[in-house]
């Protein structure tokens, strides 16, 4: 059989794609592993690291907004970004709820009643609004400074590397036994159901929103980790796609604040699962207060799955051109 020019092009494409995937995984996973190796016992140092993580998060979101503000014909593209993100969020979240609710009905679990006072959902909502404000400020300044100020290409990636390194330090020093988390069967099953239902939602979204399937799968792979998905997709496809990913994943966090108490009493897996990657951080206090202390290992096990998979899935799906 002759080796045609078309075959050669396919080989080159596959090789370049694999190199992009490997490089992307190294960029994301290496700093997390290095951070996880750092053991810190000083509580003041840990508190300082927590502040650094929040600062870097605001910087990343501001930079993403700044680059979005410098898009040509922004006034025409912004409504498309918001409407696309809302469509993605509605479809993917619906698939998550259906999949996890079926699991809840098949394997019902006892649930503790509400323990203590719920953390203020309005306080958590204000935190989300602050993050959104960083993007909006970036958009305005990017639009105003478009003629004379531009960030170097890929500069937001270096900020992301620093952020992931410090997140790795946080994971290493969270005080939860790794054995307790890894051996939690329910959390792992929930993670698998959540991942599968999210990807199904991505395919359905691609069909209804008239986008390539790989793009729909990429948008569904953020799992609520907006600081990661927005940067990865911005660098892969541009600030417009990165902004869609941001609004899609941020909406999961905001909606979770209200849906967790609503589902926890009768649909515990659903209540935990809709949070996605945020189960390890901002929504964990609400999960614990709504479902009792025994749901904490489940949430952390689930959160580990939904924090480990997004880098792999995002890098893989975003390596395909659109």
Regions found by a protein language model. Name each.
Residues 20-32, 75-98, 127, 131, ...:
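Entry/N-cap segments of selected transmembrane alpha helices
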Residues 30-38, 53-77, 137-142, 157-180, ...:
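Hydrophobic transmembrane alpha-helices of secondary-active transporters
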Residues 32-38, 84-114, 189-233, 251-264:
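Transmembrane alpha-helices that form the ion-translocation and gating core
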Residues 42-53, 69-85, 107-125, 148-154, ...:
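Interfacial helix-loop-helix linkers and transmembrane-helix boundary segments
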Residues 65, 70, 215-255, 263-301:
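Alpha-helical membrane segments and immediately flanking helix-loop junctions
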């Amino acid at each position: 059989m002759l080796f045609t020019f078309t075959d050669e092009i396919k080989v080159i494409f596959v090789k370049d794609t694999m190199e992009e995937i490997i490089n992307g995984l190294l960029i994301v996973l290496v700093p997390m592993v290095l951070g996880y190796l750092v053991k810190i016992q000083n509580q003041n140092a840990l508190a300082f690291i927590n502040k650094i993580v929040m600062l870097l998060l605001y910087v990343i979101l501001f930079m993403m907004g700044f680059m979005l503000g410098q898009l040509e014909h922004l006034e025409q593209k912004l409504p498309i970004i918001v409407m696309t993100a809302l469509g993605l969020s509605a479809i993917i979240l619906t698939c998550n709820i259906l999949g996890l609710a079926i699991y809840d009905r098949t394997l019902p679990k006892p649930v503790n009643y509400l323990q203590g006072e719920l953390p203020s959902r309005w306080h958590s909502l204000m935190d989300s609004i602050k993050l959104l404000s960083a993007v909006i400020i970036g958009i305005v300044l990017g639009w105003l400074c478009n003629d004379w100020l531009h960030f170097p290409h890929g500069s937001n990636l270096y900020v992301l590397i620093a952020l992931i390194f410090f997140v790795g330090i946080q994971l290493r020093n969270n005080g939860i036994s790794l054995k307790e988390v890894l051996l939690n069967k329910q959390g792992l099953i929930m993670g698998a159901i959540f991942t599968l239902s999210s990807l199904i939602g991505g395919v359905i979204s691609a069909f209804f929103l008239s986008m390539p399937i790989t793009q729909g799968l990429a948008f569904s792979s953020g799992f609520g980790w907006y600081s990661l998905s927005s940067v990865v997709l911005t660098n892969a496809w541009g600030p417009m796609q990165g902004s869609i990913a941001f609004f899609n994943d941020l909406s999961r966090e905001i909606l979770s604040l209200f849906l967790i108490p609503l589902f926890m009493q009768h649909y515990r897996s659903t209540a935990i699962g809709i949070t996605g990657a945020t189960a390890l951080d901002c929504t964990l206090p609400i999960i614990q207060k709504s479902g009792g202390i025994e749901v904490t290992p489940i949430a952390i096990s689930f959160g580990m799955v939904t924090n480990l998979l997004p880098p792999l899935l995002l890098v893989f799906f975003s390596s395909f051109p659109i």
